[in-house]
């Protein structure tokens, strides 16, 4: 990171953004959505998100009424401007200086559990193999914040790695209101379980201010998210936003403290996987100055090509490449 960006980050303010009927975007990404918060590049937002469900569904699955969050009741009762998707998102956040063609760097500084439960559910016509499960089922799953596990069943504990399934910016204005379910060039419902605290997401900007939305909190998830939900819950995140004029992307990209991540998105999973590989090759050629031939070979011998999700209409694939591969090259250059 350039020195000017480090100084900017150190001096940046922190904002608090609650989830209320006035700050909720139910089921869409839209360049015409009015901002609920305006911030400067380099500033941080502690943003609250809600479980994507309704009190009736949660109570129907056995959750005591007293454990339903009051904000969820308020939003379900008062938000009428909703759809076409079903996710309850917080936003959008307007980042000053962001313009189409830029990249919005989102540093995920912290992701915290907000409630002591999650749910998992599948429907009669959703998920990856609905032909095998022609009915709907929903389960409330206790979360143990101290042990950071979900008590899935007696004797079955799932480690928690909280992340936001949906983080994105406004799509191009010509796209109008976009369904929150399929991911796209704007990011959105990526459902990438690597985007935990300490990771950074890079999103191509399509509208003034970027207009960032976030939600679909997961306490954990498996790659593929095969029944259409993970450990769905409410989360609080601390996110820092930096406008990058020096980067230009066509698809979202990410990195963790130990790895680089490229992404591919397409209704055809094979084509999504091809794009993930092409994006990593482009990254290696541009940022690591490898030839395309060498980049392709490195992806094959050291890159892990994974399925992100197969249930959101637009399928997702991603490639992970360890940063440690480049340690010796850095030392030779004196970096």
Regions found by a protein language model. Name each.
Residues 52-65, 111-121, 209-219, 308-311:
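Short, Lys/Arg- and Gly-enriched loop/turn segments at beta-strand edges
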Residues 52-53, 57-96, 102, 108:
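Extended, compositionally biased flexible segments
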Residues 87-88, 94, 109-196:
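Intrinsically disordered, low-complexity linker/loop segments enriched in Gly/Pro
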